[in-house]
A protein has these predicted regions:
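Nucleotide phosphate-binding/pyrophosphate-handling subdomain across enzymes
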Residues: 2-9, 17, 21-28, 251-253, ...
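Hydrophobic Val/Ile/Leu positions in short beta-strands of Rossmann-like dinucleotide-binding domains
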Residues: 10, 110-112, 438
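N-terminal leader/targeting and accessory segments in enzymes
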Residues: 1-93, 97, 219, 244-246, ...
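Short internal beta-strands
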Residues: 30-37, 212-216, 353-356, 378-387
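Beta-strand->loop->alpha-helix junctions that form or flank phosphate-binding loops
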Residues: 35-36, 54-57, 92-96, 137-140, ...
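P-loop/Walker A phosphate-binding loop and immediately adjacent motor/lid segment at beta-alpha junctions
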Residues: 82-90, 194, 205-210, 229-230, ...
């Protein structure tokens, strides 16, 4: 897969994007080492699989390796990067490994502002159900993989394509899925035009016989379609798409809808995950399996009916005393709005949203969109911004989004500056039949279990 390379060192091996790559490389038989800032269960797993993993970063860790693999998040002054440059060691981006996987398979790449992980996971689960033995690489963790990737022997691969840093343009898939395009990742793209141009380039990487499965409801995707000459198959809720989800309704706790192709009802899907956004994600997965992989309808419907979601995607953390605690990765206004709407539709719960803003740049650029993203929540709690390594921006702080929400909707936002205080604050106000959702891309996922522990202690 990687000519002339045997010993590979991964910087940040335990990170959400790198762990999937590490697992593939170890299974392929490469001599893998890595480094990260802290111990974790996944690092222990890699050691058990034969990898050498160091805690901390040191220039000596790259001695004798043929290549190092990094992500965009790794700084240039990292001692292992510096040493690799000094020694002339090949430096690969994680997307180079994803490309190498796609190059030797019939590759499917899923991109978009939201829904990438869920859609990629659904496609993978369908192919597993159909005994296609796929290779799967995603940015989250799912139960059916017992992690975030698997190395298959079949000729299909399905990968999550990361547009955040432009690295998805290296990939050469045979099939592309674009779930949506929105004004995110402006720290990299600077302007919406640059982002749209990148997606146009992405579609142009398809071979002439390749297909782009895209959500035709999205205005930005329609713009890309007008710019690029490729075969597009559209899906969505609007009737002008090739594939349309209709008759969406709940049956008990299952979300059910019919798949229409050019006006003809061809299938009924039943999902265990909530929300219209998951209807769209599953519809995209259906089309890929049906149109591009030749999977029979019975395998598709069975797999989608078994799908319970990826970790940090409406993930149940537990129930104590009638309080249901869920965690979700939503950190963009559109994701937040969709997730809270889905939560409100489930049953008659009081929905308590606990949001940790992610990055100063995103907070600054999207504060007006954040202002109306929380309307489905009954109670709103917010913490200080999780910087993700960014420098502060003058005039942007933890009160920016709460103030915007209160001004736009007249809803009360409870501002709790320190995220460490969240569990104790919530423990005093929750009651039976509450649904608490922790939301954000930072450290907020650690605090739902802490709330549950306090509630459990209170019952003893």
């Amino acid at each position: 897969m990687l000519d002339g390379i045997h010993k590979i060192h991964l910087i940040g091996i335990g990170g959400s994007g790198m762990r999937a790559i590490a697992n593939i490389l170890i299974q392929k038989g490469y001599d893998v080492s890595g480094s990260d800032v802290a111990e974790s269960a996944v690092i222990s797993k890699f050691r058990d699989m034969g990898a050498t993993v160091h805690i901390g970063h040191n220039k000596e860790y790259v001695n004798g390796v043929d290549a190092i693999v990094r992500s965009t998040a790794i700084r240039e002054d990292n001692p292992e990067i510096v040493a690799a440059k000094e020694q002339g060691i090949t430096i690969l981006h994680r997307s180079d490994i994803v490309k190498a996987v796609l190059d030797v398979t019939d590759g499917i790449a899923v991109a978009g502002a939201h829904g990438k992980t869920s859609t990629t996971s659904m496609i993978g689960q369908i192919l597993v159900e159909a005994n296609a033995d796929p290779t799967v690489i995603i940015g989250g963790e799912v139960d059916y993989l017992k992690g975030s990737s698997c190395l298959g022997k079949g000729h299909f691969s399905v990968v999550e394509a990361d547009e955040s840093d432009g690295s998805f343009l290296k990939l050469r898939p045979h099939t592309i899925v674009i779930t949506n395009i929105e004004d995110d990742h402006m720290d990299h793209y600077k302007t919406m035009d640059n982002l749209l141009n990148a997606f146009c380039e992405f579609v142009e990487t398809l071979p002439e016989a390749g297909k782009a499965i895209v959500c035709g409801d999205n205005e930005n995707i329609r713009y890309v379609m007008s710019r690029v000459k490729r075969t597009f198959i559209t899906y969505g809720l609007e009737n002008n798409n090739d594939y349309v989800a209709k008759n969406i309704h709940y049956v008990d706790s299952s979300l059910v809808y019919d798949v229409y192709h050019k006006g003809i009802n061809i299938s009924r899907i039943s999902l265990r995950v909530p929300g219209e956004h998951n209807v769209l994600n599953s519809l995209a997965a259906f089309i890929v399996a049906h149109e591009c992989c030749g999977v029979e309808n019975r395998f598709i419907t069975k797999a989608l009916g078994k799908f319970i979601g990826a970790k940090r995607r409406f993930e149940t953390k537990g129930h104590v005393g009638g309080v249901w605690v869920v965690d979700d990765y939503a950190h963009h206004p559109t994701e937040i709005k969709a997730t809270l709407k889905a939560a409100k539709e489930l049953e008659k719960h009081r929905v308590i949203c606990v949001f940790q803003p992610h990055r100063y740049t995103r907070t600054s650029l999207l504060k007006d969109e954040f202002a109306t993203a929380f309307t489905s929540a009954d109670e709103i709690y917010m913490t200080d911004i999780y910087s993700s390594g960014e420098d502060p921006i003058a005039g942007i702080d933890g009160r920016t989004i709460p103030d915007a929400v209160e001004a736009a909707t007249h809803k009360v936002v409870h501002y709790v500056p320190s995220v460490d205080d969240i569990p104790a604050v919530l423990a005093k106000i929750v009651r039976p039949n509450d649904l608490v959702i922790t939301m954000g891309a930072g450290s907020i996922n650690q605090y739902g279990p802490k709330l549950l522990a306090i509630l459990e202690e209170g019952l003893q």
